[in-house]
């Protein structure tokens, strides 16, 4: 009724916005075509709201069958498509067992394949999941558009890939935004056979845990020296993380972030630090529920106003499979020489049973890449994004 004299009209398999020509108002005022089209565009924009799309999905009878006394003004194809797409489920912690069931079958060493790494970005993206032909599909959406954070989890099915791109294309004004992220290099051939293109997103580094603990040989001389310096000059306590440390760890991140920004003026890097803080905050808030492991280093931070040891470094991570553990965060007060090397070595000591440590990628930052390579990784894993041509 609020649309009248405009109507939602079904014609064949399409949805149209029509004008009831027999309406008294239309017959009396006889508005010019330009005014009708302007208002129709306004209505089209309003009808594109999620609340309306949900309403038409639940009540398809809202749209009447086409009649000759109705003039079709504009096509509502995008709205019709959205209304008939599968409903996307918003990701919550309650979905963790379902998601993990699929992730555990993937048997990959890529850092993105853990529920924690999916969930911690919830304050930057709306995160949705959907089951298509028994495959789990995870979508991220923000103001720019929608993409898949992971490839569909399950058996590789071309029909599922096609459906996923159809869903993303509906939500994205520019189909170039539609993509599937975090695809392993060895899987890119499957996508190329479907006429899709791949682009290197990042390279992740896997180190032998044994090497990171022993720091033996010339290749690790500087790391070994840094650890020795820290142990000799600071009375640090290496402690398992607990919830009461949360506030101090968040303060440490903010201090560390300021230090990094002072050293690196690149605007993209600085934005990454701000985005990462939101994910770090979420990780600490849901630390236990996400299955994270973490440790802190406390050092005597006594001043004229405070006494006692303060948290000057913290680190967190999660297991990817039986062989590989991923270090997700490492935050350190850079004023304490050797603290980064020390907490990393001590964390690795605690990870008994794992052969490899995934230290993640460098995100196209050369200084970070240099640091990663200085730990002499044994394997490099190419991480790709998949696009439509």
Question: Where are the model-predicted features located?
Answer:
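Short loop/turn segments that flank or connect secondary-structure elements
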Residues: 2-84
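Amide-forming acyltransferase catalytic core, primarily the GNAT-like/NAT-type
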Residues: 82-135, 139-140, 278
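A residue-level signal for conserved active-site and pocket-lining positions in enzyme catalytic cores
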Residues: 99, 230, 372
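Conserved donor-binding loop and adjoining core beta-sheet/short helix segment
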Residues: 112-183, 299-334
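Conserved active-site alpha-helix within GNAT-family acetyltransferase domains
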Residues: 187-199, 225, 364-380
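Acyltransferase donor/substrate-recognition loop-hinge adjacent to the catalytic core
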Residues: 193-268
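Short, conserved active-site entrance elements at the starts or edges of catalytic domains
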Residues: 244, 248-304, 308-310
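Aromatic (often tryptophan-rich) hydrophobic motifs at membrane interfaces
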Residues: 292-389
């Amino acid at each position: 009724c609020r649309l009248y004299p405009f109507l939602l009209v079904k014609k064949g398999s399409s949805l149209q916005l029509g004008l009831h020509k027999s309406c008294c108002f239309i017959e009396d005022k006889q508005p010019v075509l330009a005014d009708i089209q302007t208002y129709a565009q306004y209505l089209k924009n309003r009808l594109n709201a999620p609340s309306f799309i949900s309403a038409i999905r639940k009540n398809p009878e809202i749209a009447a069958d086409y009649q000759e006394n109705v003039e079709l003004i504009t096509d509502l194809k995008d709205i019709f498509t959205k209304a008939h797409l599968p409903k996307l489920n918003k990701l919550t912690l309650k979905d963790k067992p379902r998601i993990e069931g699929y992730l555990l079958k993937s048997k990959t060493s890529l850092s993105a394949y853990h529920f924690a790494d999916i969930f911690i970005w919830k304050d930057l993206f709306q995160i949705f999941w959907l089951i298509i032909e028994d495959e789990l599909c995870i979508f991220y959406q923000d103001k720019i558009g929608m993409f898949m954070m992971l490839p569909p989890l399950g058996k590789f099915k071309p029909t599922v890939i096609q459906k996923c791109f159809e869903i993303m294309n509906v939500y994205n004004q520019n189909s170039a935004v539609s993509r599937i992220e975090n695809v392993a290099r060895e899987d890119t051939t499957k996508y190329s056979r479907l006429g899709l293109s791949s682009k290197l997103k990042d390279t992740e580094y896997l180190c032998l845990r044994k090497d990171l603990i022993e720091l033996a040989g010339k290749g690790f001389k500087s790391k070994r020296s840094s650890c020795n310096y820290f142990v000799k000059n600071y009375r640090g306590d290496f402690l398992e993380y607990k919830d009461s440390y949360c506030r101090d760890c968040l303060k440490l991140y903010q201090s560390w972030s300021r230090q990094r920004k002072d050293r690196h003026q690149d605007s993209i890097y600085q934005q990454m630090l701000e985005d990462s803080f939101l994910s770090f905050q979420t990780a600490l808030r849901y630390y236990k529920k996400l299955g994270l492991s973490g440790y802190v280093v406390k050092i005597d931070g006594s001043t004229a106003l405070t006494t006692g040891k303060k948290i000057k470094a913290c680190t967190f991570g999660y297991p990817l499979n039986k062989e590989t553990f991923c270090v997700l965060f490492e935050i350190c007060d850079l004023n304490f020489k050797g603290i980064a090397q020390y907490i990393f070595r001590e964390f690795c000591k605690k990870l008994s049973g794992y052969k490899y440590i995934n230290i993640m990628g460098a995100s196209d930052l050369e200084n970070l890449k240099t640091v990663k390579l200085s730990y002499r990784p044994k394997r490099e894993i190419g991480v790709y994004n998949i696009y439509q041509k």
